[in-house]
UniProtKB/Swiss-Prot annotation:
GO terms for biological process: glycogen biosynthetic process. Synthesizes alpha-1,4-glucan chains using ADP-glucose. The gene is glgA. It comes from the Bacteria. NCBIfam families: glgA, PRK00654.1-2. GO terms for cellular component: cytosol. It catalyses: [(1->4)-alpha-D-glucosyl](n) + ADP-alpha-D-glucose = [(1->4)-alpha-D-glucosyl](n+1) + ADP + H(+). Pathway: Glycan biosynthesis; glycogen biosynthesis. It is an enzyme of class 2 (transferase). This is Glycogen synthase. Belongs to the glycosyltransferase 1 family. Bacterial/plant glycogen synthase subfamily. Its EC number is 2.4.1.21. CDD domains: GT5_Glycogen_synthase_DULL1-like (cd03791). The lineage of its organism: Bacteria, Pseudomonadati, Pseudomonadota, Alphaproteobacteria, Rhodospirillales. Keywords: Glycogen biosynthesis, Glycosyltransferase, Transferase.
């Protein structure tokens, strides 16, 4: 089956979060299962270089009147060799900063044009006007940055229209822009409506994907239910409830080629799951690297996360004084909201042997955190799927997490029964407040001191298997249900 997978970030070419991990691993798993997959990505300079994309395979023209022609480049995804197409438009993508923000952390003012071009290209490659002969049977778009792709196909109504799948990785990010962009982006005025991509007097890229795609997926069964409610739907709950029959929750997977403690080149000491001595060596090395006291019996809690309220980092700061009184150490790597960054910096300055804060994301340090930590703190207020708990399982680091989204789908709280049956793989709290979070931490610290019981929990963590094979199989089934014996069925125009 021919699948075009469109995303704004793909690991290891460019990464700001979990979307990149999924966009690198899922296409690779689909290709390994025999599917004919192409990845479409913006032509960020580093991504062009890392993919080896030197060959131009066709012109994309200048659809938005930028005065600069866009070109389609062809490269390969390092590691898996999956073909990658990159939208090379220096006027939009060749700049310092990140994929979405400038070096000062401000959204690029032309993000609407940047990601409209990505969406336009995804749809264009599905039509008879494509610069390449290869035509997808399925167009799989991801998050708001590619949400206009199904809308373009709706507007153009090509003779051979592929099936369209739109995956929500985080519904909080919606890509809302001024309505006066609609004609410039090439859409007829009637599509700017409640039954279209209009959202409270703005053009919403996310709503476009939700409204015009044939099927909607999100990254865990629990999150698929949550986003149909006002508490989690971020204003889209009505549309999602209306399309509930077309909405499926499929858990993400973990890339165990990348996250494998036995072959992890980022570690000081490679170790196999269940190797307590190897785990202890990595803990000691991490404590030394971060300037924490060399205390093998102190529970070392790690955080590998964006630092914002939706990740519950304010709860960590509020509970931190009591956590430190328990004799624990806390190590943080991540970036996010300035007040939270400053809060962790201040805590590290006040307690340098118990708290370490590394502001800014480091993939190698994230691996060493997983290897050296005893517990992973994930107090997220909402968590569509979560990937770090999968990595933690493999590295023997026990999650302490809020029961939401994919965390609720993948964690079994530690209690007498679950501990005795070998099912307990974490410490879960139901209510998102400081008291509930702190109680979960206290339970974890209490059992950490009982090594026989802690070993049971670590063993259960190591036994979890969230590789991409199962998830890729579910996506293949979904694609087949949409295409039948070939060719997309497509959603009919209203």
């Amino acid at each position: 089956m021919r699948v075009l997978f469109a995303s704004s970030e793909v690991f290891p070419l460019v990464k700001t979060g979990g979307l990149a991990d999924v966009s690198g691993a899922l296409p690779a798993a689909l290709a390994a299962a025999g599917e004919d997959v192409r990845i479409l990505l913006p032509g960020y300079p580093d991504a062009i270089k890392a993919s080896g994309a030197k060959k131009a395979v066709g012109s994309l023209g200048d659809p938005f009147g930028l005065g600069a022609e866009a070109t389609l480049l062809s490269g390969k995804l390092p590691g898996s060799g999956v073909p990658v197409w990159l939208v090379d438009c220096p006027a939009l993508f060749e700049r310092a900063g990140g994929p979405y923000q400038d070096p000062q952390g401000r959204d690029w003012p032309d993000n609407a044009l940047r990601f409209a071009l990505l969406s336009w290209t995804a749809a264009h490659l599905c039509t008879e006007n494509s610069p390449v002969k290869w035509r997808p049977q399925v167009l799989h778009a991801n998050d708001w940055q590619t949400g206009l792709a199904p809308a373009y196909l709706h507007a153009w109504s090509p003779a051979q229209r592929p099936a369209t799948v739109f995956t929500i990785h985080n519904i909080a990010y919606q890509g809302q822009f001024p309505r006066d962009l609609v004609p410039r982006l090439g859409f007829p005025p009637e599509m700017y409506a409640m039954d279209g991509f209009e959202y409270y007097d703005t053009l919403s890229f996310l709503k476009s994907g939700l409204f015009y795609s044939d099927r909607i997926t999100t990254v865990s069964p629990r999150y698929a239910k949550e986003i149909q409610t006002p508490a989690f739907g971020c204003g889209m709950e009505g549309l999602l409830a209306h399309r509930a029959a077309d909405l499926t929750g499929i858990l993400n997977g973990a890339d165990y080629e990348v996250w494998n403690p036995a072959a992890d080149t980022h570690l000081d000491h490679a170790f196999t799951p269940g190797d307590a001595a190897g785990k202890a060596c990595n803990k000691a090395a991490l404590q030394a690297e971060l300037g924490l006291s060399q205390a093998p019996d102190a529970p070392l809690m790690v955080i590998v996360s964006r630092l914002n309220d939706h990740k519950g980092m304010d709860l960590v700061l509020a509970a931190l004084p009591n956590i430190l009184k328990m004799g624990a150490q806390v190590a943080v790597v991540g970036t996010g909201d300035r007040p939270l960054e400053d809060g962790f910096r201040a805590a590290a300055a006040a307690h340098p042997t118990q708290v370490a804060a590394r502001i800014g994301y480091s993939e190698p340090l994230a691996h060493r955190m997983m290897a050296g930590g005893d517990m992973l703190l994930m107090p997220s207020r909402f968590e569509p799927c979560g990937l770090t708990q999968f990595y933690a399982f493999r590295y023997g680091t026990v999650p302490v997490a809020h029961a939401t989204g994919g965390l609720a789908d993948t964690l079994v709280d530690t209690g007498y029964d679950t501990l005795m049956t070998g099912k307990a793989n974490g410490f879960v709290f139901e209510h998102s407040n400081v008291g509930a979070f702190q109680w979960a931490v206290e339970r974890a610290v209490g059992l950490y001191a009982k090594k026989d019981q802690w070993t049971r929990i670590v063993k259960a963590c190591n036994a979890q298997d969230f590789g991409w094979g199962r998830s890729a199989g579910l996506y293949r089934d979904l694609y087949k249900s949409l295409t039948g014996n070939g060719g997309g069925k497509g959603k009919k125009k209203a």
